[in-house]
């Protein structure tokens, strides 16, 4: 009580007390602190390793914890920290002794592990630039995939592989998806922006075996593209319209029903919006047709396997079975804008179908009481309204109120 004091913070008066704690051995305090740091790290995807209960992003095989030259006995996942680390699994696996904390980075660098994420990225970018110079092509390096690759490698080596030109007859989007999303390869484009049959792979293996590593990755991509080609050719055996009824096999949302029911709502909303926008009779018919076919590719082989090409594949299939260019383009564009800064569909018809798609989701979830504020909204709901607004800004002029107010089952 005698140690109490008064103080003010942010305009509020507080009563507090001061307590002095005697100095302690830092090394003795560190284990608990460091264990708390490790257990406090969370990942969207976690795993458990062996018989321990701790969660981690990848199995933890060893721990190093030093204060100067003293080992801090941190315990985690059944392991106790020491002063031994390991290097690149092929070039210098170790173990390697670490005399002091200051030596750690030097030890792992000498063991062929580039410890800095920024340094590994710089190595990859430099290797890609050299590959571009050798091939005369330009690489696509999406930030998300590049970040993954940077963190999959300890000592990256950039290699160039090749696949058979026959696969270039498959829609480019499937090839790119197979390489970027499934294999973490980077596609190469010629001076005209056309996809080539070369690709970049970043290896974490022994550079002395570059030819063997390249050949192995070429076999992998050949198998993946063979699957893509097969799926595409199988899908083309049936008109796009035949896939529409199969949307009844896909649940959109438990209460709102199947994707077929959502597709029916998109059609009805597109008719409302096309009439309100005073589209020509031909354009209104195309809007209704595009809305009817927009989700059909979700049950095709190619999209089931390569989900990021939804809409795009529907466009290819629509064109292949004789739908108009305008309908095919609207199918491809109806997911746009996909993210902030993405352009809305280029045509009035495309924007009508895209608005109908997003509006069908927004009003359905609001009808269920799942709109914000509240728990995290499903289907990225808070982002859909700004995307609808972006399309309204681009035209054509429509009034949403009648479409929003219409019954869900009849719109």
Describe these PLM feature segments.
Residues 1-411:
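Amphipathic alpha-helical "coupling" segments that flank catalytic cores
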């Amino acid at each position: 009580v005698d140690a109490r004091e008064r103080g003010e913070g942010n305009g509020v008066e507080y009563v507090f007390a001061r307590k002095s704690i005697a100095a302690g051995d830092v090394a003795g305090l560190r284990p608990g602190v460091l264990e708390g740091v490790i257990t406090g790290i969370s990942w969207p995807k976690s795993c458990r390793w062996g018989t321990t209960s701790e969660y981690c992003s990848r199995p933890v095989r060893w721990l190093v914890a030093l204060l100067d030259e003293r080992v801090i006995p941190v315990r985690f996942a059944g392991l106790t920290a020491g002063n031994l680390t390991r290097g690149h699994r092929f070039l210098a696996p170790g173990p390697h002794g670490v005399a002091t904390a200051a030596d750690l980075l030097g030890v792992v660098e000498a063991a062929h592990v580039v410890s800095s994420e920024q340094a590994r990225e710089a190595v990859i970018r430099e290797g890609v630039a050299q590959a571009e110079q050798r091939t005369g092509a330009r690489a696509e390096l999406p930030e998300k995939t590049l970040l993954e690759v940077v963190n999959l490698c300890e000592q990256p080596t950039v290699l160039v592989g090749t696949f058979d030109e026959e696969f270039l007859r498959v829609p480019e989007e499937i090839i790119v998806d197979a390489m970027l999303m499934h294999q973490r390869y980077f596609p190469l484009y010629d001076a005209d922006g056309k996809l080539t049959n070369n690709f970049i792979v970043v290896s974490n293996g022994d550079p002395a075996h570059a030819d063997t590593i390249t050949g192995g990755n070429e076999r992998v991509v050949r198998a993946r593209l063979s699957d893509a080609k097969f799926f595409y050719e199988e899908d083309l055996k049936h008109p796009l319209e035949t896939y529409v009824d199969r949307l009844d096999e896909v649940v959109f949302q438990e209460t709102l029903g199947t994707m077929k029911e959502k597709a029916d709502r998109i059609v009805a909303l597109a008719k409302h919006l096309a009439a309100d926008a005073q589209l020509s009779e031909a354009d209104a018919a195309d809007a209704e047709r595009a809305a009817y076919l927009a989700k059909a590719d979700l049950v095709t082989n190619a999209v089931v396997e390569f989900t990021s090409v939804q809409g795009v594949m529907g466009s290819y299939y629509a064109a292949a079975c004789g739908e108009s260019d305008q309908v095919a383009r609207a199918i491809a564009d109806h997911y746009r804008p996909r993210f902030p800064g993405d352009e809305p569909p280029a045509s009035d018809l495309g924007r009508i179908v895209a608005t109908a798609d997003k509006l069908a989701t927004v009003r359905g979830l609001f009808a269920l009481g799942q709109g914000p504020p509240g728990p995290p909204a499903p289907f990225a709901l808070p982002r859909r309204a700004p995307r609808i607004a972006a399309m309204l800004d681009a035209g054509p002029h429509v009034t949403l109120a009648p479409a929003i107010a219409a019954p869900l089952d009849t719109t």
